[in-house]
Structures are given as structure tokens and as C-alpha cells.
């Protein structure tokens, strides 16, 4: 995940490097220190929607064998003892779990930063009140375009209106809310209008996710945004983030699932805002370190299986029913876990020779695996030109 606004604000209002790093950021200290990973927890696989890019291939049916309340509570205790700073409660649709607010309450009581990842369509006024009372630190709701586009992605007429209503209900109660948008060739044209909506509706955060090749996203990967379209989308997001930063407006722009974004941001700043200290920006991005899968980001699925991240369900390190998460996460006998924790990662192709490997970290291994069969091959989703990843003439920032 690239916290665009945080990076830009850090060079507009400089502070000592390493201060205020986001939970799960992939800085060197975080990689070697005692803090556990951010855990994205798919508590349930059932969902009232069947989205075209869903990585979990969720559907409106019950999936047997899911962790019950007691098991979830037990695992949370282990996660807390291991130093996990944040839980992202996801699905499926997590609000379909009858115990979701009990789980959220326990997470808050244990001191976790607790976020809810939802499609929003089930949130009416009473449920919004319960979300607010539960004390979620953040609620992310997906909007993959404007009305017609979003409803097509969701395969549900009226989904856009319900999700937008949920954003408004939660916002008006004082809950920090954000819009998640997965970029594809089919919805890129809606991005300017969606960014305008985020501004008009006073939404706290906008998260642009690149399409990752998991679940239905892999089935539909031919609809991934073309590289030119990807760059144009990022130009727009970066420009909005910079405009907010220079005006001192509190608005959080984030991108994810393509760690080349950090390198592209660095080039974008050099080109469009040359008065900023690009060498300091590079130092900040390098301290965050790019891809965090298997290191500072973890996933637990609905059955209790532990994965490197949410997109890699066909790579399992163990199950929290039979073994503590803390033991599973420290065990590097699995070759994928060992490779992800290795520094530097021994990736191949363009990734191996990239002059900005310290910023990107080798990008997303799932795409490489799905396209080539080799998890250490170059990421086919890297949209950077060869000259953009060659050695930079810019001097290194001295810390």
C-alpha cells in the first residue's frame, strides 16, 4: 500500500524519518522489530453480491467450516500478544456475521486499530448506528465507478445508491470513511467523476486498488487497465493528493496492489513539483520498503488458514485452529514464506535489476505466479518503462 498523501505531507512538512509510519509499512525497522503484521481477516466468505473482481469468489451461500466466535476470540488474544497493531475485518460481507459487533468490540477492547471492509449495501440507519457504537477506526466501502458502472461490477442494480447512502450515514455519525476503487479498463473513465464525488461528499479517504490476479480478478484479468490508462489514472490521483497537501486539506489518498506506484510517484514529483525534495521522498519511500506480503501484511481466511496476503489463498502456511498465528508467522520452513522474508528478495527479470527495488520491494508476487507460474518472476503488472527503472542520477538523501 502506498500512502500517497502521507508521503507528500512528509516532504511538505518534514519530520524525522521513520516517525508516523503507517501500521504495516515496510520500513527496515518494522521488518526486523517486534511488531507483528497488520492482519486482514476474512471472517466470512458469504456475500450478498458476486462482484466481477472478487478475490475470494464469494457468493450468497453459506460456506462450511468457518471459525466460530470462540475461535476468533482466542486467535485475537494470540494476535495481540504477538504485537499485531491492526485488524481489518473483511469478508465476503462481514456484516453478515451475527457476531461481527461482538468481535469488533473485543478487538477495540484489546487495543487494536480496527477497520471494517464492507460493500455497504446492508448499512441502513440502525446498522450505521451500531457501526458507530462499535468504535471502528475506519470503514472502507467499495465504489468501482459511478452508478451504472458500479452496479455492473457488483452485478446488482441499485448497489451504488445503497453504498453511497451507507457512506453518508457513517460519515454523518462521525465515522472515518473511505471509498475503495479497483481500477480496470472498464471503469477508468469514471475515475474523474468518482474523485469529484469523494470531494463533494467530504469522504476522508480514497483508495485506488490495482487489479490483482486472484479469484474472479484472475478470471477477468484481461480487463486489467492498460499501462497507459494506469499511468493516466495515477497522474490524476497524485495531482489531487498534491493539491490537498499544498492547501493543507486533510484528505487521504492511497493506492495498493502495485508497488511500482511508489517509483511512479517519485518520478511524478520530479516532473510536476520540482521544488519538492525528491531525494527526501525517495528516502521515505525506501524506509517504507514497498511490498509487505508475508512480512508486515498477513491474511487469515474464513477457515482459519494463514496466507501471505488476501490475494494469495492458494498459498497457505498453516491454520490457526491447530497452531498459534505467532508460530505460523515466524516459521520460514515454507519456501514462499522464506522467500518473502528474505532481504533482498531474490526476484528475477526486470525486478532484479530495477534501480528502485528499495522503493518497490519487487512488487506483487501473486501476479507473477498467476501469469508465469513462478512466484519470483518479474511482476507483469509493472507499468514502468525500462528507462524509468534505470539508475537515477538524483543524489541519495543523507539521513
What label would you give each PLM region?
Residues 258-389:
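Accessory C-terminal segments flanking Radical SAM cores
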Residues 75-91, 339, 377-399:
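Short Fe-S-cluster ligation motifs
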Residues 63-67, 363-370, 393-396:
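Short cysteine/histidine-rich zinc-coordinating motifs and their immediately flanking basic loops
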Residues 59, 92, 120, 144, ...:
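Flexible loop residues that form catalytic
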Residues 97, 123-125, 188-191, 262-263, ...:
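Short, well-ordered alpha-helical microsegments
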Residues 2-138:
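Conserved alpha-helical substructure of the radical SAM core
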Residues 1, 6, 113, 134, ...:
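Radical SAM enzyme [4Fe-4S]-AdoMet core and its adjacent flexible, acidic
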Amino acid at each position: 500500500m502506498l500512502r500517497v498523501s502521507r508521503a507528500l505531507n512528509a516532504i511538505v512538512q518534514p519530520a524525522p524519518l521513520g516517525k508516523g509510519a503507517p501500521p504495516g509499512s515496510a520500513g527496515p525497522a518494522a521488518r526486523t522489530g517486534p511488531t507483528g503484521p497488520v492482519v486482514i481477516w476474512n471472517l466470512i466468505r458469504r456475500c450478498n453480491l458476486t462482484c466481477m473482481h472478487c478475490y475470494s469468489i464469494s457468493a450468497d451461500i453459506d460456506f462450511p467450516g468457518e471459525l466460530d466466535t470462540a475461535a476468533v476470540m482466542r486467535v485475537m488474544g494470540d494476535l495481540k500478544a504477538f504485537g499485531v497493531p491492526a485488524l481489518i475485518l473483511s469478508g465476503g460481507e462481514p456484516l453478515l456475521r451475527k457476531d461481527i459487533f461482538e468481535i469488533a468490540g473485543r478487538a477495540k477492547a484489546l487495543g487494536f486499530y480496527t477497520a471494517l471492509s464492507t460493500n455497504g449495501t446492508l448499512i441502513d440507519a440502525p446498522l450505521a448506528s451500531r457501526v458507530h457504537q462499535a468504535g471502528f477506526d475506519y470503514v472502507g466501502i467499495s465504489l468501482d465507478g459511478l452508478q451504472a458502472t458500479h452496479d455492473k461490477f457488483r452485478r446488482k442494480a441499485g448497489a451504488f445508491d445503497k453504498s453511497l447512502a451507507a457512506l453518508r450515514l457513517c460519515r454523518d455519525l462521525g465515522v472515518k470513511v473511505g471509498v475503495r476503487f479497483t481500477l480496470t479498463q472498464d471503469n477508468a473513465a469514471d475515475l474523474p467523476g468518482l474523485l469529484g464525488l469523494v470531494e463533494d461528499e467530504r469522504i476522508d479517504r480514497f483508495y485506488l486498488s490495482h487489479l490483482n490476479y486472484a479469484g474472479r480478478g484472475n478470471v477477468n484479468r484481461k480487463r486489467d487497465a492498460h499501462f497507459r490508462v494506469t499511468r493516466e489514472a495515477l497522474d490524476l490521483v497524485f495531482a489531487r493528493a498534491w493539491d490537498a497537501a499544498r492547501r493543507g486539506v486533510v484528505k487521504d489518498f492511497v493506492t495498493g496492489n502495485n508497488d511500482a506506484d511508489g517509483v511512479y510517484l517519485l518520478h511524478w514529483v520530479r516532473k510536476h513539483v520540482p521544488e519538492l525534495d525528491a531525494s527526501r521522498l525517495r528516502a521515505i519511500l525506501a524506509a517504507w520498503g514497498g511490498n509487505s506480503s508475508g512480512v508486515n501484511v498477513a491474511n487469515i481466511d474464513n477457515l482459519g488458514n494463514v496466507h501471505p496476503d488476501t490475494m494469495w489463498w492458494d498459498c497457505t502456511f498453516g491454520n490457526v485452529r491447530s497452531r498459534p498465528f505467532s508460530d505460523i508467522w515466524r516459521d520460514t520452513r515454507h519456501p514462499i514464506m522464506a522467500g518473502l522474508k528474505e532481504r533482498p528478495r531474490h526476484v528475477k527479470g526486470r525486478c532484479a535489476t530495477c534501480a528502485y527495488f528499495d522503493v518497490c520491494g519487487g512488487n506483487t508476487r501473486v501476479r507473477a505466479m498467476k501469469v508465469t507460474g513462478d512466484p519470483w518472476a518479474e511482476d507483469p503488472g509493472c507499468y514502468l518503462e525500462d528507462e524509468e527503472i534505470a539508475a537515477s542520477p538524483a543524489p541519495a538523501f543523507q539521513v
